[in-house]
Amino acid sequence: MGVMAMLMLPLLLLGISGLLFIYQEVSRLWSKSAVQNKVVVITDAISGLGKECARVFHTGGARLVLCGKNWERLENLYDALISVADPSKQTFTPKLVLLDLSDISCVPDVAKEVLDCYGCVDILINNASVKVKGPAHKISLELDKKIMDANYFGPITLTKALLPNMISRRTGQIVLVNNIQGKFGIPFRTTYAASKHAALGFFDCLRAEVEEYDVVISTVSPTFIRSYHVYPEQGNWEASIWKFFFRKLTYGVHPVEVAEEVMRTVRRKKQEVFMANPIPKAAVYVRTFFPEFFFAVVACGVKEKLNVPEEG
C-alpha cells in the first residue's frame, strides 16, 4: 500500500497542476471575452494604474477611451499599446481624450464627445486620484476644494453624465478605484480620506438606485497603489502595535495587481473588493466594532511620531 501511495502521489500532483492550469487559462480567456467589443472609459489613464488597466483591457479586445490631462503622455501610452498588440487577436485603436477631472466644467463636454463617437459606454473606470498629506490645520481650504474636485466631484460628474445612457440601455458597469481610507481615516490625510469617504458613500448609494436597471456599481479599494520601484523605508517599525499596523499598511499593492483585480471585478460583476493584507483588513472591522480601541491605538501612534509627552 505504501509503495502504491508513493507511485500515485506524483500522478495526483500532476493531475492537480493540470487542472489548475486549465482553470487559469479558462479564467484568462473568460476575462478577455467579458470586455471584447465593449466601450471602456479609463480616467487618468497615464497614471501607473491607468496604464496597466489600459494594457489589460486593450489586450482583452475593449474599445478604449483613454482620458488624461497630458496629451504627450497619452500619445506615448497609445504608441506603447499599439506596439505590443498581438496581430493575431482582435484589438481596437484607443481613442484619446484630454480630461482633467479637477476642472469639472469640461467633464460634460468630454462625456458628450465619447457618446457621440461610440453611441454608448459599457464600462467606466473612475481611476483618477490626487493625494495630499499634512496636518489638517496647515492644509488650506483652497487645497481642500481642489482635492474634493479631483477625487469626488470630478468622478461623480462624469458618472452622472454617462449614467443616463447606461440606464436607457439597461446595461453597464461603473468601477470606482478608491482606497481603504474610504473606510477609515489615517492621521495627516484628512482631506484625502474625506474625499475617499465621500466617493465611497456616493457609489454605495448609487448601487442600490441603479440595480433595477442592471447597472453594476463596483468599488475596488487597495491600501494604496505603490509606484513601480518604491518600497517602504527600513526602520524600527516593530516598536509598537500602531507602528506594526502602519508598516503593514504602507506596503500597498502593485499597479499590475490592481489592474488584474479590476478586470476580475468587471468579469464577475463584484460589488466591493478590498485589496490589503490581513492587518489593514482587520483594522476595518476593529474600527467598526471597537471604535474606541481603534482611535486610542491611532492616537498613540501620532503621539509617538510627534514625540508628544503623555499628560500626568
From Swiss-Prot:
GO molecular function annotations of the record: all-trans-retinol dehydrogenase (NAD+) activity; oxidoreductase activity, acting on the CH-OH group of donors, NAD or NADP as acceptor
Q: What reactions does this protein catalyze?
A: all-trans-retinol + NAD(+) = all-trans-retinal + NADH + H(+)
> Which domain of life, per UniProt?
Eukaryota
The keyword Transmembrane helix is assigned to this record: no
Alphabetical list of SUPFAM superfamilies matching this protein: NAD(P)-binding Rossmann-fold domains (SSF51735)
What's a Pfam family this protein contains? adh_short
Leader sequence range is 1-18
Tell me, what is an example of a GO biological process annotation in this record?
Answer: D-glucose import
CDD domains reported for this sequence: 11beta-HSD1_like_SDR_c
Domain writeup: The N-terminus region encompasses a short hydrophobic sequence bound to the sarcoplasmic reticulum membrane, whereas the C-terminus catalytic domain faces the myoplasm.
- Give the protein name, as stated in the record: Dehydrogenase/reductase SDR family member 7C
State the organism named in the record: Homo sapiens (Human)
